[in-house]
Curated annotation (Swiss-Prot):
Catalyzes the condensation of pyruvate and acetyl-coenzyme A to form (R)-citramalate. Makes part of a pathway for isoleucine biosynthesis, i.e. the citramalate-dependent pathway. Also displays a low alpha-isopropylmalate synthase activity, using 2-oxoisovalerate as substrate, but is unable to use 2-oxoglutarate. It comes from the Archaea. Gene3D superfamilies: 1.10.238.260, 3.30.160.270, Aldolase class I. This is (R)-citramalate synthase. Residues 6-272 form the Pyruvate carboxyltransferase domain. Keywords: Acyltransferase, Amino-acid biosynthesis, Branched-chain amino acid biosynthesis, Isoleucine biosynthesis, Transferase. It comes from Sulfolobus acidocaldarius (strain ATCC 33909 / DSM 639 / JCM 8929 / NBRC 15157 / NCIMB 11770). Pathway: Amino-acid biosynthesis; L-isoleucine biosynthesis; 2-oxobutanoate from pyruvate: step 1/3. Belongs to the alpha-IPM synthase/homocitrate synthase family. InterPro entries: 2-isopropylmalate_synth_dimer, AIPM/Hcit_synth_CS, Aldolase_TIM, Citramal_synthase, LeuA/HCS_post-cat, LeuA_allosteric_dom_sf, PYR_CT. GO terms for molecular function: (R)-citramalate synthase activity; 2-isopropylmalate synthase activity. Inhibited by isoleucine.
Length: 523
């Protein structure tokens, strides 16, 4: 009878550190370890202490922090063929790291034994036994990673099984089946893992690489077959094409298979934030298409989809997005319908019927603007301004009569005339100078405009915009400290597109603030 709980070993700090173009500082590793402990993983593989001084330092530094659940594990290889376990540097570095858990990898593919290590099959079994037994004799919990297990099993089942049985006999607490080359398919993983589960009494684990795109699916199928320990990294970073993404594996195990893991379902709500922080640390922009936690994972663009989801969320969503700390989103675009527009209006407290001809007019105008280069799925606030105009709810709060930018090497000067008020401002670049000038003109009437900050600025160049050859699209993100919104401008000039997006962003804030304050519910 299989247990209902699945252990999680995170190897972001070890296998994830082997990702090309990624290098963790010691502070990065500590920060991630504390984040993983808060999430509720069972083991944190901190690194390979015999390979570099930074990992050695990590095992010393992490002792200064009190972890709530996770156990720190040190990684290493089985003993070298020419040394005894007692003399082996890798094994002794694990003991020296003063951790509770040692993760050992050893050979289970006969090809690696005879052609890489160039030793006999029996000699490799002795190496496995000696290494595991040595760590156990020092009081460590041992997780044995059977490297290249699935490939080895397919070529020599008897020897692969003998290798893991040897680790079990030596006292290994968990035996992990590794798809090191990442080439095994899900149905193979299921059949092979099930066979191992029937031959080995200790807990079976899984360590999958993503070279054929199946790391997550392979991990899930291994759990279905009876494995109760999974390994992976946050966001799937790792050697070559990466490891199994724990951000996907964990909710699949808990929400789809109904098994227990981490600290329970409350931990799942932290997945999006954990994913975001790790992306931030490695300097990679979050993948918006990432299952479960990506910004687009529960985003509905097609009008038919949006309409159905607004009636019954299960119609086009496999789970409630809030379970994993995410949110449902609707975007406005050329394939969107009235339901998408209504969603954003209802967020402002505006109730309208989707059959209202004014809504249909707004949708048509949005589609026409998209054909000219706009992309409102990236900047829905600009589309809301279009809808407010068609609904007759738009107020002329900002009337820019004139603007001009004089751009020198390190300084830009902007002159604007807003609502009859002429202002001049200096800034670092044209967008900054126009922003300052606009605020100077507006703050006398709308002092609340000073709450608004620019948080992101992006330019999409000509050739990247569909149906256009010469226009540029500028998207700007704003915040008032409580909510965020994006607007955009399209023009043949980067500066003009920026000014359009900037004016829209400030205008959106004032328009929506007026709507909320006046409690416009029906019109």
């Amino acid at each position: 009878m299989f247990t209902k709980s699945v252990e999680v070993l995170d190897t972001t700090l070890r296998d994830g550190a082997q990702t090309a173009n990624i290098s963790f500082t010691l502070n990065d590793k500590i920060r991630i370890a504390l984040l993983l402990d808060e999430l509720g993983v069972d083991y944190i593989e901190g690194g390979w202490p015999s390979s570099n001084p930074k990992d050695e330092e990590f095992f010393k530094e992490i002792k200064k922090y009190k972890l709530t659940k996770a156990r720190i594990a040190a990684f290493g290889s089985t003993r070298k063929k020419e040394s005894t376990a007692k003399e082996d540097q890798s094994l002794n570095s694990i003991i020296k790291a003063d951790v509770d858990v040692g993760v050992l990898f050893g050979k289970s593919w006969s090809l690696h034994v005879t052609d890489v290590l160039k030793i006999s099959l029996e000699e490799n079994l002795d190496i496995i036994y000696d290494s595991v037994n040595y760590l156990k004799s020092h009081g460590l919990r041992v997780v044995y990673d059977a490297e290249h297990f699935y490939q080895g099993y397919k070529e020599n089942r008897e020897y692969a099984l003998k290798a893991v049985k040897t680790a079990e006999e030596a006292g290994a607490d968990v035996i992990v089946l590794c798809d090191t080359n990442g080439g095994t398919l899900p149905h193979e993983v299921y059949n092979i893992t099930k066979d191992v589960v029937n031959h080995v009494k200790v807990k079976i684990g899984l360590h999958m690489h993503n070279d054929s795109g199946g790391a997550v699916a392979n991990t899930v199928m291994g759990v279905v077959a009876g494995a109760r320990h999974v390994q992976g990294t946050i966001n799937g970073i790792g050697e070559r094409t990466g490891n199994a993404d724990l951000i996907q594996v964990i909710p699949n195990i808990m929400l789809k298979l109904g098994l227990n893991s981490l600290k329970g379902n409350e931990s799942l709500k932290k997945l999006k934030e954990v994913s975001r922080v790790v992306y931030e640390i490695i300097g990679v922009h979050p993948n918006p298409y990432q299952p479960y936690v990506g910004d687009f994972a529960f985003t509905h663009k097609a009008g038919v989809h949006a309409d159905a989801v607004m009636k019954v969320t299960r119609a086009y969503e496999h789970i409630d997005p809030t379970l994993v700390g995410n949110n449902r989103r609707f975007v406005i675009s050329e394939v969107a319908g009235s339901s998408n527009v209504i969603y954003y209006l209802e967020k402002l407290g505006i109730k309208v019927d989707k059959k209202d001809p004014r809504v249909r007019n707004a949708v048509q105008r949005i589609k026409e603007l998209e054909n000219r280069g706009y992309s409102f799925d990236l900047a829905p606030a600009s589309a809301v301004l279009v809808a407010l105009r068609d609904l007759g709810m738009y107020r002329d709060l900002i009337k820019v009569e004139y603007w001009k930018v004089m751009n020198e090497k390190e300084l830009a000067i902007a002159i604007v005339k807003v609502n009859g008020q002429l202002e001049v401002a200096e800034g670092v670049g044209p967008v900054h100078s126009v922003d300052i000038a606009l605020r100077k003109a507006l703050q006398k009437v709308y002092p609340q405009i000073n709450k608004v900050k620019l948080t992101d600025y992006r330019v999409i160049l000509p050739g990247e915009i569909k149906n256009t050859e010469s226009v540029v699209r500028v998207t700007i993100e704003f915040t008032d400290g409580e909510k965020n919104w994006r607007t955009e401008g399209v023009s043949t000039s980067v500066i003009e597109a920026s000014v359009i997006a900037l004016i829209d962003g400030l205008d959106y804030y004032l328009q929506t603030e007026k709507l909320i304050k006046s409690e416009v519910i029906n019109n």
